[in-house]
Amino acid sequence: DAVGNTKLDLSANYAFTGAISGAGRVLQQQFANFNLSGVSITSTSYVASAITDSITPSATSSKIMITAQVPVFVKASQSSGGANWFARGHIALYRDSTQFIDNTSMGGSGYTTSSYNYGHVEGYATWSWLDSPSTTSAVAYKIYVKLSALQGTGQVELNGVASISLMEMQN
């Protein structure tokens, strides 16, 4: 017998039967990196970025955990002196062609008395979302970006390595 009173014989072979089950079990995972360079967005409507990945759920009851990390630089500028300005970059997640989440924004602001200057904010924006797509067909998730310039002008730049991870979990 491989199992004694209190010891497990580690040199023996064991066979386990049955399936691992239960909510939260990871069924599959997709991961993608994107090297972004010189991507500049000045549109006040959402524009698709290159950050995308897709997954085909194995059951309609599955949950998809989406995690994304995006390098964002928001620049606000004013071409005439003596003005305050402010710009904000917005990042949204789309499932296929439908906006799914829009809860992340970063802003740059400043004040100048010179002929041209700018204020900015930069960093990595990181999020996790839990989705219930209720399908066994392929589902594509994509990051969209837009600018809102409340005063002056501005732009959102994506520069650096972005990533997106999709994890199907049993519900």
Model-predicted segments: where are they?
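Extended, low-complexity regulatory regions
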Residues: 51-53
